[in-house]
């Protein structure tokens, strides 16, 4: 669940959040978002305890309200995941395009919203999708083990970046200013981040989706969800602070991905 919550957004979006809301306001907003998600986690924990089956929201809505409610709620949830899959599938290509712009700019297909799309990007994104599809088909044990090691590696990298930032040449607490966007004020600055927080924590609900495969008591689900959300919130806050005190506001506005 932690690995699903933390994706490319935690490394790409802190600069945008700081620019829109200010550093501390962004950190507060993303923390409030986690607390709101925990309320949903309470519901999931109670449902898993009563319905320890796989399927997540689909199974719960079907068992509680019948096929029609389950049909519509599950499709709306599916549409949400389709958006996330599209973003994650193109994230690696997007990162390569930013780091090595000349390498992927071959075979231009079209321009949308001022962004050029190349066939090389699509090939890379498709290859990664097929790779992870194959891993998923192999079974939960294989994919679960890989995700576990990926999460460990990500936590180590985040901690190294955060604590290493204290020794960076650009480190300065004054760079955190303004703590909140001056024109918008604290309330609006925080609410703007709270509004996008549900997207930032998408994925924590994958724990209930595999409840039937648990080798522990279902009542532990709530604790797992809460711990995952708190860990994800901590990661977001660390990346916001890391970005904030290592970059001035001017650099933030000129760089695409200041983090």
Which sequence ranges carry the predicted segments?
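Hydrophobic core segments of alpha-helical transmembrane domains in multi-pass membrane transport
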Residues: 33-36, 128-136, 155-165
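Helix-loop-helix junctions that connect adjacent transmembrane segments
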Residues: 27, 103-120, 148-259
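The first (N-terminal) embedded transmembrane alpha-helix
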Residues: 1-12, 199
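Short amphipathic alpha-helical coupling elements at transmembrane boundaries
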Residues: 49, 56-63, 70, 145-148, ...
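Extracellular loop-to-transmembrane helix junctions
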Residues: 10-113, 228-234
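Select transmembrane alpha-helical segments in multipass membrane proteins
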Residues: 1, 27, 66-79, 125-126, ...
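Membrane-water interface regions at transmembrane-helix termini and the short interhelical loops
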Residues: 48-49, 72, 127-153, 210-213
């Amino acid at each position: 669940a932690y690995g699903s919550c933390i994706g490319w957004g935690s490394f790409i979006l802190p600069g945008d959040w700081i620019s829109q809301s200010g550093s501390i306001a962004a950190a507060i907003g993303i923390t409030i978002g986690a607390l709101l998600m925990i309320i949903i986690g309470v519901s999931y924990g109670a449902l898993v305890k009563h319905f320890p089956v796989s399927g997540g929201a689909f199974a719960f809505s079907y068992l509680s309200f019948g096929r029609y409610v389950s049909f519509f709620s599950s499709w709306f949830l599916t549409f949400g995941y389709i958006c996330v899959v599209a973003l994650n599938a193109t994230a690696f290509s997007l990162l390569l395009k930013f780091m090595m712009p000349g390498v992927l700019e071959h075979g231009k297909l079209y321009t949308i919203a001022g962004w050029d799309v190349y066939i090389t990007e699509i090939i890379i994104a498709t290859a990664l999708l097929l790779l992870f599809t194959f891993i998923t088909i192999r079974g939960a044990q294989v994919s679960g083990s890989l995700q576990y090691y990926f999460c460990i590696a990500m936590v180590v990298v985040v901690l190294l970046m955060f604590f290493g930032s204290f020794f960076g040449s650009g480190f300065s607490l004054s760079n955190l200013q303004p703590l909140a966007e001056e024109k918008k004020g604290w309330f609006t600055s925080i609410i703007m981040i709270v509004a996008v927080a549900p997207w930032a924590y998408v994925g924590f609900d994958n724990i209930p989706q595999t409840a039937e495969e648990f080798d522990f008591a279902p009542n532990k689900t709530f604790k797992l969800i809460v711990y995952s959300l708190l860990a994800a919130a901590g990661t977001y806050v660390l990346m916001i602070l890391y970005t904030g005190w290592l970059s001035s506001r001017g650099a933030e506005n000129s760089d695409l991905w200041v983090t």
